[in-house]
């Protein structure tokens, strides 16, 4: 691993010279320093790293607070150009945890049997062509994978095939469903055994309902097209405060047409043949309604807008809605963080909100006092140390649901990071 001292010295010199009078600074000096910083960056993105504690605000060259680096696998390990979404699977027989890492050219499988020395087991190649967009979810020991690649459809992969594997290989899908061409995302309700493909070429980009209770026989059973393109969604069997919908299967969609139509859509999808709109609502300074997640009591919805930081120049903003009355959601809190980076994907586990924050990496918040409109950042791990500006670099997605507490971060330029809360 490159020592952080080298990186920081170069960065300091670069910033110092930039603040000098331009007449006193030779252009070739700026170029030399910029090239040196780029060389350090190249080394970061091609070096396998093992356990590095977070000490004095850094784990190696990565800014951090409260999270140690367990391991880092750069893109060169996977022979890929960029990373995107990721997810996790724990083998119910062996207890071994696996990361499913989305890449431009496929999906990589990584065993965490020894977390400080993760083992790359190989790749399921993209069904057709490479794409910077790929999304993965898991149900019943199977991975379900979609992509924006033309004619990609849905790949289904039996994860139990990874048992006992110790060497890298190229895999083939168990099922290749070609009922649709492209899709941006997939969500799964594990309580009902239905997958929801969104942003596809069907139903005008709205959710497509797929029965996956028989893993090798996925079947489209319906869809919804009335509220424009759905970018992401969470689906639950509702157990929140609105008594009218207790026990119903509800979809919370983040919808955008990339122009003026940006809104959250709540659907009752209990009857797949006749989904019903409960409500659709927008919000101030909407730019691109990207992704949201419910608190575990289903009362609050944490929403990320992907373009508001760029379009309106604000600090990173998370909009929290009170869904006590599902037919009339209320803005509860518009939270601004300490960085200007763009929020991408966020997930809630118990009283913590985990966010993939692009150039600011992983950000973790205590939400135990959300009723009192309070959030507190309690930790972070910055996989993109160059800056925390509003740009599309850094952490695309994080997976915080492993029982071990290990969090998998997919960084667009730098591959897979495994981090864990620093022991107190």
Regions of interest found by a model, annotated:
Residues 23-424:
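Feature marking well-ordered beta-strand scaffolds used for ligand recognition
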Residues 16-19:
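C-terminal motif of bacterial Sec signal peptides marking the signal peptidase cleavage site
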Residues 1-7:
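Bacterial N-terminal signal peptides that target proteins for export
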Residues 11-12:
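Core hydrophobic alpha-helical membrane-spanning segments
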């Amino acid at each position: 691993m490159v020592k952080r001292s080298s990186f920081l010295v170069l960065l300091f010199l670069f910033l110092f010279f930039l603040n000098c009078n331009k007449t006193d600074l030779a252009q070739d000096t700026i170029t030399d320093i910029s090239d040196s910083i780029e060389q350090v960056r190249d080394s970061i993105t091609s070096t396998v790293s093992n356990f590095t504690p977070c000490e004095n605000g850094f784990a190696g060259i990565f800014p951090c607070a409260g999270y140690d680096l367990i391991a880092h696998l750069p893109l060169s390990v996977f022979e890929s150009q960029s990373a995107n979404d990721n997810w996790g699977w724990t083998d119910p027989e062996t207890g071994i945890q696996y990361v499913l890492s989305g890449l431009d050219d496929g999906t990589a499988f990584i065993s965490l049997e020894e977390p400080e020395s993760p083992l790359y087991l190989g790749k399921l190649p993209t069904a057709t062509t490479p794409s910077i967009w790929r999304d993965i979810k898991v149900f019943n020991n199977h991975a379900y994978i979609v992509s924006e690649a033309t004619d990609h459809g849905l790949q289904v992969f039996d994860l139990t095939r990874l048992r006992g594997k110790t060497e890298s290989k190229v895999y083939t899908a168990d099922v290749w469903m070609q009922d649709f061409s492209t899709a941006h995302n997939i969500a799964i309700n594990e309580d009902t055994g239905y997958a929801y493909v969104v942003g596809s070429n069907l139903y005008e980009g709205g959710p497509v309902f797929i029965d996956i209770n028989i893993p090798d026989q996925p079947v489209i059973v319906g869809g919804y097209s009335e509220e424009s393109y759905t970018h992401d969604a969470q689906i639950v069997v509702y157990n929140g405060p609105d008594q009218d919908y207790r026990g119903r299967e509800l979809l919370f969609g983040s919808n955008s047409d990339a122009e003026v139509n940006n809104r959250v859509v709540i659907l009752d999808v209990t009857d797949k043949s006749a989904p019903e709109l409960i409500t659709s609502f927008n919000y101030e300074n909407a730019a691109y309604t990207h992704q949201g997640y419910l608190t575990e009591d289903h009362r609050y919805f944490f929403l990320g807008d992907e373009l508001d930081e760029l379009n309106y120049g604000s600090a990173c903003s998370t909009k929290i809605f009170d869904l006590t009355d599902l037919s009339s959601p209320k803005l509860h809190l518009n939270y601004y963080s300490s960085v200007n980076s763009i929020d991408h994907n966020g997930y809630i586990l118990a009283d913590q909100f985990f966010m993939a924050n692009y150039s600011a990496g992983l950000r973790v918040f205590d939400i135990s006092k959300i009723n009192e409109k309070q959030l507190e950042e309690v930790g972070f791990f910055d996989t993109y140390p160059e800056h925390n500006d509003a740009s599309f670099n850094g952490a695309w997605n994080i997976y915080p649901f492993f029982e071990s507490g290990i969090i998998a971060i997919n960084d667009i330029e730098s591959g897979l990071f495994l981090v864990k809360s620093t022991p107190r």
